Curated annotation (Swiss-Prot):
Record family assignment: Belongs to the CemA family.
Catalytic reaction(s) noted: K(+)(in) + H(+)(out) = K(+)(out) + H(+)(in)
GO terms under cellular component: chloroplast inner membrane
Gene name, Swiss-Prot/TrEMBL: cemA
Protein name stated in the entry: Potassium/proton antiporter CemA
Main localization, broad class: plastid
Origin organism lineage: Eukaryota, Viridiplantae, Streptophyta, Zygnematophyceae, Zygnematophycidae
């Protein structure tokens, strides 16, 4: 068996897969080294071109090109370093295992000739290095890559402060936040002022056409719209899925075992609240009545009271188990809801700039529609929330929410909510139409009232 393993190791060592496997760290480091050379060349050429007069005219286009090259080079450098470290770690562990195995065979007393001819000490030590690559060369390349990364950060700072900010601030009144934790560090959003943006944009475009700068602002406008849409979609996806995923993972891994152990061992009660106990009593009465009805219909005279009591006892134990699990589920629902709300609040608090971008993007989509479509969507939303048939929907929502937190259906609570909450929504909507929409676009208000009538 040992000779068979040695033969397999000899064949693996002489195969092309083995050479490819041992050369993986060197290939990864070489890719990162080539990408760092590209960054250093861009840094040298950027300093040379910046002093030319043509840079003032084509500076923004040059910055766009530099950004694309830097993004690609940065990805290659970081991915190559990650692959280098991971493969180096795996190869080190693997070579240590092979060296221990070879050393154990060398110290055997029988003197295995097959092993002595194929695996000597010098060949075993070769497994601890990276395919004839010295540490001095590796350290020199790593130092070069580190210097290239420093140049890359300097290039990003220089290219981000040249032409896009003054153009957009002067022509479109756009703010560019520079510290967003996203795929792009420069995500733009437009501020909303008292004057409608359609008027300011029309005036800005007129000035741009007169000054002959229409070509130079097409790319900034496209880049602004692209970053705005990308950041808004990412933020909306995070707001929807991240709290749900985080609370579900916490529920499965941590909360469910802890709550089940606590409720089954530390608590003597079965019911979470009084409504569960009342529902269990009503269910038990129904089961007992159905059992007596079956006995009367079947006309079984030999049915003893002890058998009836035993069946009722078994049904009671089943109900206890059902409501015990329901109590655990209710506690889990409350905890997961609290975790989801906390996660959502953290996202809204830490992502204020993203929220401003998302708000601006939604307003851009809304104001880009025609007046008829705007009035249609407003009518659709109001009819769903405060329309004639909306109380039935609110009753279903409140009933499901009460069942979710472990309470029974209470018609007084539902009636109180349905009679007050839609009225508050109607008041807020009318205030928004009167105060904001009437000032921004009076034609929408006229179309809305016409369609509503």
């Amino acid at each position: 068996m040992c000779c068979y393993l040695n033969l397999l190791m000899i064949q693996f060592e002489s195969s092309h897969i083995c050479h490819w496997f041992w050369n993986t760290p060197y290939r990864a480091l070489q890719r990162a080294y080539k990408a760092s050379k590209k960054v250093r060349n861009i840094h040298t050429n950027y300093i040379f071109c910046k002093s030319k007069p043509a840079f003032q005219r084509f500076g923004y286009n040059l910055d766009l090109y530099i950004d694309s090259i830097l993004d690609e080079s940065s990805f290659q450098i970081y991915w190559g370093l990650l692959e280098f470290k991971a493969s180096r770690f795996v190869l080190t562990k693997f070579s240590n295992l092979i060296f221990k195995h070879n050393f154990h065979l060398l110290t055997q007393t029988d003197g295995n000739k097959l092993f002595s001819n194929s695996f000597d000490r010098e060949q075993s030590l070769l497994f601890c290095d990276i395919h004839s690559t010295s540490l001095k060369i590796i350290n020199r390349k790593l130092a070069w890559i580190e210097a290239a990364l420093a140049d890359l950060e300097m290039l990003r700072d220089n290219s981000s402060s040249t032409s896009i900010t003054p153009i957009l601030n002067k022509v479109y009144n756009v703010s560019l936040p520079m510290s967003l934790d996203s795929t792009s560090k420069r995500v733009a959003y437009e501020s909303v002022g008292l004057v409608p943006r359609s008027i300011t944009r029309t005036f800005a475009r007129f000035q741009t056409e007169l000054a002959g700068r229409s070509v130079s602002v097409v790319l900034p406008e496209f880049r602004l719209a692209k970053y705005q849409a990308t950041a808004s979609v990412q933020y909306m996806a995070c707001l929807i899925f991240l709290p749900w995923v985080f609370s579900t993972i916490c529920k499965i891994i941590f909360l469910q075992p802890l709550v089940s152990h606590y409720w089954d061992t530390m608590q003597t009660q079965v019911f979470f609240n009084a409504s569960q106990e009342q529902r269990a009593l009503r269910r038990l009465q129904q089961i007992e009545e159905l059992l007596w009805l079956d006995i009367v219909i079947a006309s079984v005279p030999n049915k003893h009271l002890q058998d009836i009591a035993g069946e009722i006892h078994n049904k009671t134990l089943e109900l206890v188990d059902i409501y015990n699990r329901e109590s655990i589920c209710t506690i889990l629902n409350l905890l997961t809801d609290w975790i989801s709300i906390t996660c959502l609040a953290c996202l809204l608090t830490w992502g204020k700039k993203r929220l401003a971008i998302f708000n601006s993007w939604i307003q851009e989509l809304f104001y880009s529609l025609s007046d008829t479509m705007k009035a249609f969507f407003i009518l659709l939303l109001t009819d769903l929330c405060i329309g004639f048939h909306s109380p039935h929907g609110w009753e279903i929502i409140i009933t499901l929410f009460l069942e979710h937190i472990g309470f029974a259906h209470n018609k007084y609570v539902v009636s109180c909510f349905v009679s007050t909450f839609p009225v508050i929504l109607d008041t807020v909507l009318k205030y928004w139409i009167f105060r904001h929409l009437n000032r921004i676009s009076p034609s929408i208000v006229v179309t809305y009232h016409t369609m509503n009538e």
